[in-house]
Amino acid sequence: MKQEQQPTPGARATQSQPADQELGSNSPPQRNWKGIAIALLVILVVCSLITMSVILLTPDELTNSSETRLSLEELLGKGFGLHNPEPRWINDTVVVYKTNNGHVMKLNTESNASTLLLDNSTFVTFKASRHSLSPDLKYVLLAYDVKQIFHYSFTASYLIYNIHTGEVWELNPPEVEDSVLQYAAWGVQGQQLIYIFENNIYYQPDIKSSSLRLTSSGKEGIIFNGIADWLYEEELLHSHIAHWWSPDGERLAFLMINDSLVPNMIIPRFTGALYPKAKQYPYPKAGQANPSVKLYVVNLYGPTHTLELMPPDIFKSREYYITMVKWVSNTRTVVRWLNRPQNISILTLCESTTGACSRKYEMTSDTWLSKQNEEPVFSRDGSKFFMTVPVKQGGRGEFHHIAMFLVQSKSEQITVRHLTSGNWEVIRILAYDETTQKIYFLSTESSPQGRQLYSASTEGLLNRDCISCNFMKEDCTYFDASFSPMNQHFLLFCEGPKVPVVSLHITDNPSRYFLLENNSVMKETIQKKKLAKRETRILHIDDYELPLQLSFPKDFMEKNQYALLLIMDEEPGGQMVTDKFHVDWDSVLIDTDNVIVARFDGRGSGFQGLKVLQEIHRRIGSVEAKDQVAAVKYLLKQPYIDSKRLSIFGKGYGGYIASMILKSDEKFFKCGAVVAPISDMKLYASAFSERYLGMPSKEESTYQASSVLHNIHGLKEENLLIIHGTADTKVHFQHSAELIKHLIKAGVNYTLQVYPDEGYHISDKSKHHFYSTILRFFSDCLKEEVSVLPQEPEEDE
């Protein structure tokens, strides 16, 4: 540095030149090359310092010029597809999973060695889109011509494929060719097969045996054996499967659902024929006749014998649902019975050899009972079982926590011991290890927005340990898990906040793991995109602490003003503000239109205790709207929110809440878009509407107050987009038709986008148009208004 402060050698040389030297002299000038080099070096150092200063003082997001904005085409492309390896435990040391390339592999958990079971070309050859491996790993069921029916159910044709020989044959009922089945799957032992055709159950002891029809009462649209009708699939079981294997494969429990008194809903199909066709299916609306249900157990070995398991006496003269069935031994099942108002639940333990059932636990509520699908976890001898129950935690109300039930043999008396407590929720019990006397579960103890895997001792001091808290803790705070049959290993599913990964762990030493899927393609794609930054805040509303999540544009600056989009949840009891990885159509809007997206879990949302959840009892539509408006009022106090550019979006129940907010007296929103909106709870499913509002015959005023159609004049000031598929079997197009009829009568302008013959979930072929419609609507509505100055008249020359 001292050299920089001195005159350069070159300067001294110039000054020492002879004074009488002529300017035009031919003699070469005397140059100091060493001095010139030093001068250039100094200039280079100074330039480097300036460049470094610019880089250090420039925000990171501005320096990474390789980042590009996210487009809808990219979002729907392969680069943004998360791969689910669909891992399944075969036994304690074998996991079967599917690679990103479509190969089906077998992983040995002791050696971490993978073996190819099924090449991806097999799926191409047979045009199969679904598969299922036999328990002995010798055969695979391949489903082709798959057609979705409702949310979970589908029909398909099936092939049985020999993995080792390549031999293949069709799976058909006796004397039927080219059959379309409602369900087909392997049993729990060897090559047992079960399939459902025309609402009847068929059984094969192995792939070479003849099929045995287990039921004969099945009738399309009326009697459902082993498979759910719409109501049970969508609102009660949350699955289309309504049958359950005993652990040894010798017995099968199944529901017989009778819809003979249930009114039918008609869904027209407008395209593809000269005259529209229609399909109808039983759909009980609020207050209408419900399906009746019976539970049977059939013995599969020896002469087939079918036995009915009877409901508790209290339900024999009442309407009831069956919400959970589970085998706890080779001969005993545990069953949950729920009354129609959904405020009385009884858990019974049934002996399948005699049909005798004993009551083990009863729950009642002044509102409604949640978590009625939860399966209790039993010890091997059945002397104890574990289940989550609501436990009061001071002024915060009740939270779901683990209780251990000690069963008295040949008696209905039980002893209860609570294993966890606190202002947090146990999400699900995963396993009980009798050797270590530990219970494994997921909970929100670390954060209401996260999910961590914990263990707790069931004896002594009930010590609790977080197993997942230190695993990839910068990237993963939201987990799910699955334990092997003997609990020696577990699969850990990291679902966010960073790109999801799936790993295999040893239970005794969880820090040792094998990475099953890291979604590397998605990670590489994400790194090249200017995706939103998320931030969670806690709002205090009516003595509640409620979470608000904001997604900011990557180059967000607080001095600027931004438009706001508020997104509603699709279901009551859900959770919008989580640590789960999220990239969706709203990510495109944030990136391309510099919009801030807000999600808020107000009263009526889940996983924050029953007090928050059940505030909407008999008040659905009003409490949620009030809290969302309170969140908007908070946001309007922030200097970066443009009060003239506010919008709202919701689908299904979320569309219902968005509509209730838009028609309220609070006029914040410039526009709103609703997809398949529920407009009147009387038109919606019985189990849903009655859970929150009761029976319409007794709660007429409550139903009227909860209807969007009531006092609809409030929608006059907003720009409203309604989107609906005409073949929606969940929220019928009838809801939008009634809404539009009332809008026209009230003189309200609206925009309607209809998707002919599309359901609640828009198909892949229409998805680009669907998202484009929503994005274009919000882009036009939320664009910044530029003030145009009046032009001064030009002066005449």
From Swiss-Prot:
Residues 1-28 are annotated as: Disordered. It is found in: Cell membrane. Pfam families: DPPIV_N (PF00930), Peptidase_S9 (PF00326). Detected in brain cortex (at protein level). Expressed in the brain, predominantly by neurons and not by glia. Its main location: membrane. Keywords: Cell membrane, Glycoprotein, Membrane, Phosphoprotein, Signal-anchor, Transmembrane, Transmembrane helix. GO terms for biological process: protein localization to plasma membrane; proteolysis; regulation of potassium ion transmembrane transport. The chain crosses the membrane at residues 35-55. GO terms for cellular component: membrane; plasma membrane; voltage-gated potassium channel complex. One of its GO terms (molecular function) is potassium channel regulator activity. InterPro entries: AB_hydrolase_fold, Peptidase_S9_cat, Peptidase_S9B_N, Serine_Prot_S9B/DPPIV. It is a single-pass type II membrane protein. The modification Phosphotyrosine is found at Y139, Y144. Residues 1-34 are cytoplasmic. Residues 56-797 are extracellular. N-glycosylation is important for cell surface expression, specially at Asn-258, which is crucial. May form oligomers. Interacts with KCND1 and KCND2. Belongs to the peptidase S9B family. DPPIV subfamily. PANTHER family: INACTIVE DIPEPTIDYL PEPTIDASE 10, PROTEASE FAMILY S9B,C DIPEPTIDYL-PEPTIDASE IV-RELATED. Promotes cell surface expression of the potassium channel KCND2. Modulates the activity and gating characteristics of the potassium channel KCND2. Has no dipeptidyl aminopeptidase activity. This is Inactive dipeptidyl peptidase 10. It comes from Mus musculus. The gene is Dpp10.
